[in-house]
Amino acid sequence: MRLDWCRHLALGALSMICFTPSLAASDLQKDTSLGLAPQDADLYMASYRCREQWEQFLQSKAVREIHQLDYVQKIVAKFKAQWESADGQLAQAKTVLKTPLAQDLIKLATEMASEEMFLFSDGKASQFLVGVNALNEELVEATGDGPEAILEWFESLTREDLNQVPIPTFVLGFKFQDEDRALNLLDQLQAVVSLGLNSNPATVQFAEAFQRVEDARGTRLVLNLHASMLPWDVWEAGSDSKELIQHWEQLLEGRKAAITFGILDKYLILAMSEDAKQLTKLGKQGGSLAQHADLKPVMADPSKPLTGVAYVSDRFAEAEYAAQYQNYFSKIYRQLAPSLALITEEGEIPEFLEALESDLEWLDDEVDQLMPDFKGSLSFSYSTKTGSEGWLFDRTESQWFDGSKRLDILDHVGSNPIMVSAMRRQPGTDWLTLARKVMRKAKGYLEAYLNSDELEEEDAEELAIVMKKGWPLLNRFADVIEQKMAPATRDGQSALVIAAGSLESKQWVKDMPPASSPLPLPEMAMVTGLSDKDLYVQGCAEIYSILDGVVDLVRELNPEAIPEGYSIPRPERKTSGGSEVFLYPIPEDCPVPKDMAPQVMVDARWAIASYSAKQSAELMKMSSSMNAKLQYKDRNLAGASYVDLGAFFKFAKPWLRYAIEMDKGDINTPLSDASDEIPAPTGKDVLDFIQALGSLGKVWATTELDGTGTKTHWRFEE
């Protein structure tokens, strides 16, 4: 099953790096690399106005507080003093940095890091991935048949096979201002590289392929590489496989690539392509990525200050899925087949595993039928007065999220959580059905293994007991999930909630030395939406019964492992405010707060698993505070999340103080030995740093269904 939520978090984090005042969207094609990237680009990532991003980061509250710390000020002062009185190697470095060449390099690097930076590929990147994956699958299959099969595979390759692996164009670029400075540095780079290549007979041919290109779009240095430049004669002389080397020399004849560095319009680029001439077509022929229909959300509001864009094409997303996950299980089998053959003395796959390859191919087909057609994504971000915001459009049909209804579980995440991750999932019955099919096939293999000659007598006896008594328990558990827990939670809503709460103690474990001040513990709960409370309670009770069976099975296999008569303890059952509570009371001699007890609180609509009675009671009540924070105005949501980043550091500080006091006795004691370069930090210095991180901001995100895909909107505020 596709992990949509993880992908949203990853791409959302990528777009969050860009959150400063930037360009109007109407100027994107003219003023940014979106006008340079081809319309068929497979990948595009860009960050705009980088200097302002850095300046805004430095002006954030947490960074300002860190900069003002005594220890940081000491380090800064120490560095300045060392720099001013530099001697030895540091003095030499200081002298080098003052040379005109070094100054020009520093100024150019500053320009490159101040404006715009980007990376994109053309449409051949997906073709390259598809071609490499196809060849890799053939190679893996040949690997399973031994070294001779691998050699035969290499010998069987044709030019048509290699033509399926084109060389894509990748361009890494930076916007700059001073063209004269850049040209001067290109001149010096050309001179140094040419001198180095011509000074060695082995690299003279590379010197001849190293060229300077000047046209209306700029000046660039190009290294043209050809397959003929490879040392075929040397390889033939030192190899026993001359025919294979000659075969590959013929296969690669005419293949070429170019590495380009220099100026293209207002950008300094480093590019790899099949032909350097392809770069001159960028932004001029075939349209630009800014004109692509997938980029319409970026262009929709020209008044917002755009700060970053990340784009993946449908072709590349499909190729990436095929390369990583298509035929996943049969690929693993082919890789492991040689090892499986070592199980028997004859060096062949054991008889009970002969059908494994075909069954794994069946499993691949079943999974493939359940998976959606993978498509690409688009994320982009803007700056705001209080931080930043952005969107992620994932065009792949979601088989996990259900956004058809209001996400009313957000009314039951408390009044002031420090973290919430809520969603509504689809039933997923097709996956449960497939899991049962896999279980039946797995049982067949275990039974065949039991009846084979591969097991020692004692091991066979234990496996026979497991199959006789353990497998029915597994079947019962699957029945409970499919027939009780899944229908009982068909509502599909769930939420992980972490709150500050009131749980604190100077001593959390009896053997733990008491702390000088209370140590807080965040309250954590899992809230689950119920469609049938009675069925849910019955399912939980059945799971306890199954666990008792597991205890009996373990005791039979190893009588000394579990005492006779022991069974899984059942929770106490109470009522509280119209809800039923199933809990395990904390023992009287345990030093933790007495209102702390592992429990599940259940009413007709919700099940709340927690270890805090106060949190369970609060979450069972309705609260609209999260709705106000998310600002989603009762829209139908598939998911929502909220994190107070600084709050986690505030919780960590007392525990870190306790650890330092236990180790050093006093927070003012240095934590390490001082050196001439860096003063040793004390425990207080570390605690002050953690205190500053407590000023980090908050992140909100909501996910909605958008056609067949999903749309996630996130906000970051200090």
Question: What residue spans do the PLM features occupy?
Answer:
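Bacterial N-terminal signal peptides that target proteins for export
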Residues: M1-A10
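Bacterial N-terminal signal peptides
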Residues: A10-T20
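Structural boundary/hinge residues at secondary-structure and domain interfaces
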Residues: A25-M229, V312, F316-E348, E354-E357, ...
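One face of beta-strands
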Residues: A41-M45, F170-F174, T219-L221, I269-M272, ...
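Charged, amphipathic alpha-helical scaffolding segments
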Residues: V140-L151, R159-P168, L172, L252-L282, ...
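Short Gly/Thr-rich strand-loop-strand
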Residues: Q177-I259, K296-V309, L519, V537-Q599, ...
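A conserved glycine-rich beta-strand in the N-terminal activation segment of trypsin-fold
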Residues: E249-S339, L407, P591-P681
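Interaction-prone hydrophobic/basic patches in short secondary-structure elements
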Residues: P563-E564, P571, G577-D595, L645, ...
